[in-house]
């Protein structure tokens, strides 16, 4: 099912995001959070207005790493969800299947996948630059 594909992708990609998020949150200066508290901000507001914005570059980087890892995943997807065309088949699985029958089709799918990945990474880079200018 589609849910099995999502779970398989999350299982494989989550450690990449968690590691980056943890590093981002650990890099936030606790003195800034303490100052926010002394000025009367509640913990949730401190988290939302101080901690998350300062950790955002790491959170975004972790999301990109997790996405990139999930994009190329096929082992866990085959094990958990199978390889049913039109239902649970991801692009890497389609490439794998096409390699057995038609190498040109596999190359075409791989080029499309690489184009999608490149477009997303370029868009992320543009957003990251815009975000760094806003800070």
Predicted features and spans:
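Interhelical loop and adjacent transmembrane-helix boundary motif
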Residues: 78-118, 123
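Loop-to-helix entry region at the N-terminal start of transmembrane alpha-helices
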Residues: 1-16
């Amino acid at each position: 099912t589609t849910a099995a594909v999502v779970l398989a992708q999350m299982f494989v990609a989550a450690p990449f995001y968690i590691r980056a998020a943890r590093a981002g949150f650990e890099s936030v200066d606790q003195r800034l959070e303490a100052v926010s508290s002394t000025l009367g901000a509640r913990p949730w507001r401190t988290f939302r207005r101080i901690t998350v914005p300062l950790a955002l570059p790491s959170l975004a980087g972790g999301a990109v790493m997790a996405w990139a890892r999930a994009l190329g995943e096929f082992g866990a997807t085959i094990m958990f969800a199978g390889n049913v065309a039109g239902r649970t088949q991801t692009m890497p699985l389609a490439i794998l299947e096409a390699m057995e029958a038609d190498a040109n089709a596999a190359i075409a799918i791989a080029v499309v996948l690489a184009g999608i990945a490149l477009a997303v990474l370029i868009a992320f880079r543009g957003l990251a630059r815009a975000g760094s200018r806003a800070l």
